[in-house]
C-alpha cells in the first residue's frame, strides 16, 4: 500500500517528489536530484518545459479529457505512419502495460499460438504475461542456456501463463537462437 506504481517502490519507502524543473527533481525534504528516470523515458523534454506548459494550457482551454478521438490523435498517427514505413495502422493505448497486453493478444490471435518469448531482465509492463524474469531471484534463474520463467516478486502468476512464457538471456544471441528455434512453432511473438 501507499504507492501508485509498483515499479518505483523502494523499501522502506519510495522517493516522494515535490516538483521538477528541466532534468532536476526535488523531493518533499528539499533534496535535489538529477532525474535519470524521466518518467521511464517518456519525459524527453524534462520537467516543466515552457513550450510543453504552453501547449498543455492551450489544450486545457479547449477541454480536459475526452473519450473521443480528435485532430491531434489523427495527426500523430499520420506522422508515425509516415516516419515508419512498415507501420500501416496505429492503436493508441493508455499505458505501456496496456500496449504490450494488446500487442500480445493481437499476436496470439493472428498466429493462433500461445507462447511468447521475452528477454531475461526486460520490463514490459505490469500484467501476468510479462511480469516474468524481470529481476529474478538468482537462485531460481536456471542455466544461462535455458533460463527459467520466474514470476516477478513471487507474484501469483498462474502456472499456465508461466509455461507460455519462454525466457531468453539478454544480449546473448548465440544462446538465445537455439531457444527461439526450439520453440518457434509455438511462439506468437518475441517481446524485446
Name the predicted role of every residue range.
Residues 78-186:
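PLP-dependent aspartate aminotransferase-fold enzymes
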Residues 18-20, 37, 44, 94, ...:
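Short glycine/serine/threonine-biased micro-segments
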Residues 26, 45-46, 132-133:
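Short beta-strand-to-turn element immediately C-terminal to the catalytic PLP-Schiff-base lysine
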Residues 1-4, 61, 85, 185:
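Generic structural signal for secondary-structure transition and capping sites
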Residues 188-192:
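Condensing-enzyme catalytic core of the thiolase-fold
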Residues 14-35:
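Active-site and channel-lining beta-strand-loop segments
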Residues 1-19:
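Active-site-adjacent loop/helix segments that line or gate small-molecule/cofactor pockets in enzymes
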Residues 32-114:
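Glycine-rich loop-to-alpha-helix module at the N-terminal edge of alpha/beta enzyme cores
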Amino acid at each position: 500500500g501507499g504507492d501508485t506504481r509498483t515499479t518505483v517502490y523502494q523499501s522502506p519507502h519510495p522517493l516522494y517528489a515535490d516538483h521538477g524543473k528541466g532534468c532536476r527533481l526535488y523531493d518533499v525534504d528539499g533534496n535535489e536530484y538529477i532525474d535519470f528516470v524521466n518518467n521511464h523515458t517518456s519525459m524527453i523534454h524534462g520537467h516543466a518545459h515552457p513550450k510543453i506548459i504552453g501547449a498543455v494550457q492551450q489544450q486545457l482551454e479547449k477541454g480536459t479529457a475526452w473519450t473521443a478521438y480528435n485532430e491531434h490523435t489523427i495527426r500523430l498517427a499520420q506522422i508515425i505512419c509516415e516516419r515508419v514505413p512498415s507501420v500501416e495502422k496505429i492503436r493508441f493505448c493508455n499505458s505501456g502495460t496496456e500496449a504490450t497486453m494488446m500487442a500480445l493478444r493481437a499476436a496470439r490471435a493472428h498466429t493462433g499460438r500461445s507462447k511468447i518469448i521475452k528477454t531475461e531482465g526486460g520490463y514490459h509492463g505490469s500484467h501476468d504475461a510479462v511480469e516474468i524474469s524481470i529481476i529474478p531471484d538468482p537462485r531460481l534463474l536456471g542455466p544461462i542456456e535455458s533460463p527459467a520463467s520466474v514470476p516477478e516478486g513471487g507474484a501469483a502468476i498462474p502456472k499456465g501463463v508461466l509455461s507460455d512464457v519462454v525466457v531468453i538471456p539478454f544480449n546473448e544471441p548465440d544462446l538465445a537462437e537455439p531457444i527461439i528455434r526450439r520453440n518457434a512453432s509455438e511462439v506468437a511473438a518475441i517481446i524485446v
